[in-house]
């Protein structure tokens, strides 16, 4: 073994050895027996290699010699003499002589140049692999010298004679371990023919099979502005340490305006500072810290399809792993042709070595633009792409475009990546920088070859023709993954749904060819050759070539970081990398495929525990659903969901989940590989897969509602109220409310009951039924009704009469309306009344409008309808007929105000409302007889309800669903707040019952109205929501004539109404006109429900009842695009967690209506709950309310009791429970007071204790002590021990003491309003704002 110490030997001896070797090589060449000169003359070769840097010099000389030595006619002696001359010449390591010699040789015999070049290149490749020389005795052994020490030109010589053979001989000779060890710099001995090593290493020295160029881009960074692009990658990437890449270029940014930066570019330097080795956050910080002005980015732009990650991470390994196809390159970097080809300067594979020494100045670059070119015909390596005008290289004039960089400062670069070569060039020390390049004797030929290679690379990218490259990349990835990249592969597999790996394989192939069946996990049945490398290659080629595959790759890149990986995946398959690697590759491909279509929800993927089975199941399901079983798309989607499951699912979860129910979705997605449509289609499939139907159904239903939030009973209530005032609504309500309710029940039922949901959803199609109901119901709009007309009182009387007079509610329409309301109320009542049901359940049921009822939809409807019928019984039968005609038909006839008395007797507020407007009382005769035919008794009412339910109720139910769509009722904030306020289960049950009952009854009315007004629009789905809103708004507009700005309903009125009912006092009619509106709504409820409700209300203590006072449902009538007249403050992301009214604009709608006040908590807007939302989301909901012509706002005044309860509910369950405890304890003992303190620079003059997470647990925030001399001490407005409920409009429930102090600090100096709860009944100096 030669030791490295030999590297210090004199250059002369090395030169002589090289000369002798050149002579031997010449002899060997002339024999042209194809055997390696290394094998024939191992000692000289080994010796030359052993010389280290000296060897390098000699190598160059030898290269010259070998190039001539080829099949040249020049005698060996001539070569020797030339070599001697070079030796003698040699100052500066004889570089100039070498250059002259090379040129001379090229002129004398161009044919020799080719072999020399071939050898040089092969040796170069050898060097990266064999970093250390091992055994001198073995001529075929890999040279262990590090690449920097190896004289690769010489090695190239040695390899040159083997030009022909490298194609077949050397491709796979080198073991993986050897290849890995050598690049790592290990000195492990490997007995291999040098040529095989060189061939194995001939894989693109550029470090990637994709052509890429390094260039500088100057961008202008403005003040407080970015550069207009986002980045991914970093050494902390889940795929392993990778560079920083451009992910997205934003339109309108600096990068887009410049136009040179491309997505997928690797950022090497920022203002001259290297980005290598940075984590993602570090890179972001670098960009953020960059000062405004001109920024210089050094980027590597790929001219072809993105390469595999492995190529980035370990290019040398990748190259060494190249397959036999790459071997051809090793024979000569530019020559695929056999070396025996006749020597001719015109031959493109001929090369000469030229050394150029450039003088580098401090702080100035050399001006050499580099590019790496994948193997193409006879070209591969790192080349001079451009020379900057005026630069050192340009002025020197010796370097040409198309020159291949062979060595820089005595360091071979064939084993280096483009990035590494750039780093070497850019960081050279000032002074002479020797560069050895290889070029064709005619520089123009080299330049043309480079251009063609780049153009071909681009073409390959476009048409996916890089099969061999891919296979090579695959091999590279395979070996590289084994060597140090396994983590990257593993991460890919993990991220890309490892359970589906096999299927993913198949999917990749299938995805590459959408026509393939990916049912078989191993490969699509159609692509049985998938296992075969060639077929795999083709398939992979197709997949990358397909825009779908690549675009998805880009999408996956966001997740996987590098878009470049997509092509390598197929390659890995071609090269038959380990299954794991193949899978990972396929996974990457699938990701892109799936990325286009929205990924199905994770649930769907979870269901498929076995990737193959799941794939097969998906195929089966897809087949059953009529979709092709292509699992590739499915798997891709599965992978995507895993990668991007929640976002995509959130966007499409309803439909996608419906589509995803199980295997079915996957196939559908595949069939619709292009994207979302497939998912939509998958929804039917979801039905086919019962397992996921329930969840999917719910999601689908949510989709239909176009709001993921739960329906808001308050919104419905408000809508109902609007409709109540509008006779049209009441009329429409007859028909529509029942059906809409049914549809709601069905949809809700689907949500509540996954099993039942899918069919119901299918039957209803989410919205169709509702639409139908809307269509079925057509009613003329009547004049607007005042918010609290006399009919309210009458309705109260009627309600009371209802108890006394069973004929009071006979009107079938009324009964029908009450039926849905009563039914829903019954559901809510069931929820609330059932003591067994938990508050949360009640809340959820309340939010979903009796989701608990959903299981018993039919029964509940019937029971509710009969109950409503019974409730209606008390009303007059004659009225029953009228209302049935009016409401049931939703016919143009309007109620006459004269009839309000009858309406009151019937007790249907809607009817009374309709009459008040002066709408013609006479219902369509057809309907009247129908309703009349039904006996007034409960049975007839049930019949009427059933019949009307079929006609009107179905629509009514649908209308609620429409309403939900129009106003996403998915979230019922007020309901949630009440129900979530677990302070007292009684209070919440009552609130849920009342709100649900009112909401349902009102919903029936408004839904009918909206249905009548927009019978067809609701069918459109999302439009129905807006349309229904607009319709209701139109109705409201009719009402607005009487109520210009709108009206408000206080839940306390409902409470009083229930009390009035219990007391049966008619005096209350006049006293509680507003209450009567609520009472009129309640009148729709069945007597049984009312009795139960009354009983529960009786049980409630006053403190709990008082909490109802603060909740108001306000309906504002406005023009489209008009604001609501108030602004919002607070949010889950702010100190003030509760969304409150920040300011009421003087001339706005809210100010004109008068109910909404500054500081009120906003529970929901147009059915969208604001509970737990961020400030930004709340503002977005507020802006969305501009579109409809009606706005329904549920607010809660900061009354002493209502506010804390609400706050507690909004803050958290724990705080809510704590607040509930407090409220329960303090109901009889505590007094809620509002005080005003002056905030000074020193604060409010008191300290706090308690709070969430205190030493004593979650306690309310209380005043600990009052500072002496403070205004609070002098005024004695507050006392130690007082609980702070609200401070400056910010609820303090559930806050930590630190958060409370931050709120106090943030308050402006001046008067501050504080709501406190004092445990003693004596509230001396406070204003009893919360006693009510």
Swiss-Prot record:
Keywords: Chemotaxis, Cytokine, Cytoplasm, Host-virus interaction, Nucleus, Phosphoprotein, Repeat, Secreted, Transcription, Transcription regulation. Residues 896-909, 1023-1041 have a biased composition (Polar residues). Residues 510-519, 829-845 have a biased composition (Low complexity). Disulfide bonds: none annotated. Changing residue 757 to A: Reduces phosphorylation. Enhances nuclear localization. Residues 481-495, 571-589, 605-620 have a biased composition (Basic and acidic residues). GO terms for molecular function: CD4 receptor binding; cytokine activity. Homotetramer. According to PubMed:9699630, the formation of a homotetrameric protein complex is not required for the chemo-attractant function. Isoform 3 interacts (via PDZ 3 domain) with PPP1R12A, PPP1R12B and PPP1R12C. Isoform 1 interacts with PPP1R12B. Isoform 3 interacts with GRIN2A. Isoform 3 interacts with GABPB1. Isoform 3 interacts (via PDZ 3 domain) with HDAC3. Isoform 1 interacts with GRIN2D, KCNJ10, KCNJ15 and CACNA1C. (Microbial infection) Isoform 3 interacts with HTLV-1 tax. This is Pro-interleukin-16. It comes from Homo sapiens.
């Amino acid at each position: 073994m030669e030791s490295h110490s030999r590297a210090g030997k004199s250059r002369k001896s090395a030169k002589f050895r090289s000369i002798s070797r050149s002579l031997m090589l010449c002899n060997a060449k002339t024999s042209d027996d194809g055997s390696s000169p290394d094998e024939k003359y191992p000692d000289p070769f080994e010796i030359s290699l052993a010389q280290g840097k000296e060897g390098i010099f000699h190598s160059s000389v030898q290269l010259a010699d070998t190039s001539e030595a080829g099949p040249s006619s020049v005698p060996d002696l001539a070569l020797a003499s030339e070599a001697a001359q070079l030796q003698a010449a040699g100052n500066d390591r004889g570089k100039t002589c070498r250059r002259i010699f090379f040129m001379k040789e090229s002129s004398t015999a161009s044919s020799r140049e080719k072999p020399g070049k071939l050898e040089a290149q092969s040796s170069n490749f050898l060097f990266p692999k064999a970093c250390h020389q091992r055994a001198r005795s073995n001529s075929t052994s890999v040279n262990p010298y590090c690449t920097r020490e190896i004289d690769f030109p010489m090695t190239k010589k040695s390899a040159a004679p083997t030009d022909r053979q490298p194609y077949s001989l050397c491709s796979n000779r080198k073991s993986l371990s050897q290849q890995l060890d050598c690049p790592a710099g290990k000195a492990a001995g490997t007995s291999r023919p040098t040529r095989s090593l060189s061939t194995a290493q001939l894989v693109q020295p550029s470090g990637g099979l994709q052509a890429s160029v390094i260039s500088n881009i100057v961008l202008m960074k403005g003040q407080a502005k970015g550069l207009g692009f986002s980045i991914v990658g970093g050494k902390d990437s889940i795929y392993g340490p990778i560079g920083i890449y451009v992910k997205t270029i934003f339109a309108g940014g600096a990068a887009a305006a410049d136009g040179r930066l491309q997505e997928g570019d690797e950022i090497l330097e920022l203002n001259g500072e290297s980005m290598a080795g940075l984590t993602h956050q570090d890179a972001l910080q670098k960009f953020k810290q960059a000062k405004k002005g001109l920024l210089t980015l050094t980027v590597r732009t790929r001219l072809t399809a993105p390469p595999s990650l492995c190529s980035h991470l370990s290019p040398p390994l990748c190259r060494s792993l190249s397959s036999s196809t790459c071997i051809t390159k090793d024979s000569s970097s530019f020559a695929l042709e056999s070396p025996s080809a006749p020597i001719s300067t015109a031959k493109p594979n001929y090369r000469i070595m030229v050394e150029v020494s450039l003088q580098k100045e401090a702080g100035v670059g050399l001006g050499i633009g580099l590019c790496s070119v994948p193997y193409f015909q006879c070209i591969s390596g790192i080349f001079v792409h451009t020379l900057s005008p005026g630069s050192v290289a340009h002025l020197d004039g010796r370097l040409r475009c198309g020159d291949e960089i062979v060595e820089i400062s005595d360091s071979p670069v064939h084993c280096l990546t483009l990035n590494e070569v750039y780093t070497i060039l850019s960081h050279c020390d000032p002074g002479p920088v020797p560069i050895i390049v290889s070029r064709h004797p005619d520089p123009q030929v080299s330049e043309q070859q480079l251009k063609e290679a780049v153009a071909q690379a681009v073409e390959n990218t476009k048409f996916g023709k890089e099969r061999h490259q891919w296979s090579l990349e695959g091999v590279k990835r395979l070996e590289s993954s084994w060597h140090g990249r396994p983590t990257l592969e593993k991460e890919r597999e993990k991220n890309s749904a490892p359970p589906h790996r096999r299927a993913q394989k198949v999917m990749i192939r299938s995805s590459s060819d959408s026509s393939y069946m990916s049912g078989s996990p191993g490969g699509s049945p159609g692509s049985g050759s998938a296992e075969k490398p060639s077929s795999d290659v083709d398939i992979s080629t197709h997949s990358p070539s397909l825009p779908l595959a690549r675009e998805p790759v880009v999408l996956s890149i966001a997740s996987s970081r590098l878009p470049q990986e997509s092509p390598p995946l197929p390659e890995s398959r071609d090269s038959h990398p380990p299954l794991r690697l193949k899978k990972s590759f396929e996974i990457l491909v699938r990701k892109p495929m799936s990325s286009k279509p929205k990924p199905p929800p994770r649930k769907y993927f979870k269901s498929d525990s076995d990737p193959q089975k799941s794939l097969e199941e998906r195929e089966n399901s897809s087949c059953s659903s009529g979709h092709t079983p292509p699992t590739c798309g499915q798997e891709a989607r599965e992978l995507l969901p895993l990668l991007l499951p929640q976002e995509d699912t959130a966007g499409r979860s309803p439909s996608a989940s419906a589509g995803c129910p199980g295997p079915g979705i996957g196939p559908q997605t595949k069939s619709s590989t292009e994207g979302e449509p497939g998912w939509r289609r998958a929804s039917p499939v979801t039905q086919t897969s019962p397992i996921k139907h329930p969840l999917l159904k719910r999601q689908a239903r949510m989709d239909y509602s176009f709001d993921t939030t739960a329906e808001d009973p308050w919104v419905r209530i408000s809508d109902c109220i609007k409709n109540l005032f509008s006779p049209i609504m009441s009329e429409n309500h007859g028909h529509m409310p029942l059906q809409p309710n049914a549809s709601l029940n069905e949809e809700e039922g689907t949500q509540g009951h996954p099993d039942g949901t899918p069919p119901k959803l299918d039957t209803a199609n989410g919205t169709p039924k509702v639409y139908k109901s809307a269509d079925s119901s057509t009613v003329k709009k009547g004049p607007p009704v005042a918010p609290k007309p006399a009919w309210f009182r009458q309705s109260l009387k009627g309600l009371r009469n209802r108890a006394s007079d069973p004929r009071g509610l006979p009107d079938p329409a009324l009964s029908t309306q009450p039926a849905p309301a009563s039914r829903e109320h019954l559901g809510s009542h069931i929820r609330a009344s059932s003591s067994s049901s938990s508050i949360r359940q009640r809340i959820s049921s309340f939010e979903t409008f009796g989701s608990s009822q959903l299981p018993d939809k039919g029964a509940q409807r019937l029971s509710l309808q009969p109950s409503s019928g019974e409730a209606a019984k008390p009303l007059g039968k004659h009225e029953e007929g009228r209302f049935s005609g009016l409401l049931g038909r939703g016919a143009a006839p309007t109620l006459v105000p004269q009839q309000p008395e009858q309406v009151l007797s019937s007790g249907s507020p809607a009817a009374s409302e309709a009459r008040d407007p002066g709408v013609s009382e006479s219902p369509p005769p057809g309907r009247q007889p129908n309703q009349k035919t039904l006996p007034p008794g409960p049975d007839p009412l049930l019949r009427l309800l059933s019949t009307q339910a079929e006609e009107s109720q179905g629509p009514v139910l649908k209308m609620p669903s429409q309403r939900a769509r129009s106003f996403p009722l998915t979230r019922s904030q007020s309901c949630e707040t009440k129900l979530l306020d677990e302070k007292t289960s009684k209070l919440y049950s009552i609130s849920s019952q009342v709100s649900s009952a009112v909401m349902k009854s009102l919903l029936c009315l408004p839904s009918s109205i909206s249905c009548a007004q927009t019978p067809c629009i609701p069918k459109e789905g999302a439009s129905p929501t807006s349309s229904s809103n607009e319709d209701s708004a139109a109705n409201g507009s009719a009402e607005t004539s009487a109520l210009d700005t709108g009206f408000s309903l206080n839940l306390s009125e409902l409470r009083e109404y229930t009390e009035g009912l219990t007391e049966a006092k008619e005096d209350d009619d006049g006293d509680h006109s507003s209450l009567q509106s609520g009472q009129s709504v309640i009148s729709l409820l069945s007597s049984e429900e009312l009795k139960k409700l009354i009983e529960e209300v009786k049980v409630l203590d006053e403190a709990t009842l008082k909490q109802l006072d603060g909740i108001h449902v306000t309906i504002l009538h406005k023009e489209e695009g008009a604001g609501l007249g108030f602004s919002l403050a607070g949010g889950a992301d702010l100190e003030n967690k509760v969304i409150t009214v920040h300011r009421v604009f003087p001339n706005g709608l809210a100010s004109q209506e008068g109910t909404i006040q500054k500081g009120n908590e906003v529970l929901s807007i147009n059915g969208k709950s604001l509970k737990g939302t961020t400030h930004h989301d709340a503002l977005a909901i507020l802006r969305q309310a501009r579109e409809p012509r009606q706005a329904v706002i549920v607010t809660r005044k900061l009354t002493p009791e209502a506010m804390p309860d609400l706050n507690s509910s909004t803050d958290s369950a724990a705080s809510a429970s704590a607040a509930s405890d407090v409220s329960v304890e303090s109901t009889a003992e505590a007094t809620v007071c509002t005080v005003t303190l002056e905030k000074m620079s020193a604060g409010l003059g008191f300290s706090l204790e308690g709070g969430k997470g205190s030493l004593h647990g979650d306690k309310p925030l209380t005043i600990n002590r009052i500072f002496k001399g403070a205004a609070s001490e002098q005024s004695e407005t507050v006392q130690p021990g007082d609980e702070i409920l609200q401070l400056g409009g910010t609820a303090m429930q559930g806050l930590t003491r630190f958060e409370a102090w931050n709120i106090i600090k943030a308050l402006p100096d001046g008067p501050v309003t504080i709501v406190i709860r004092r445990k003693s009944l004596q509230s001396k100096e406070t204003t009893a704002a919360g006693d009510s």
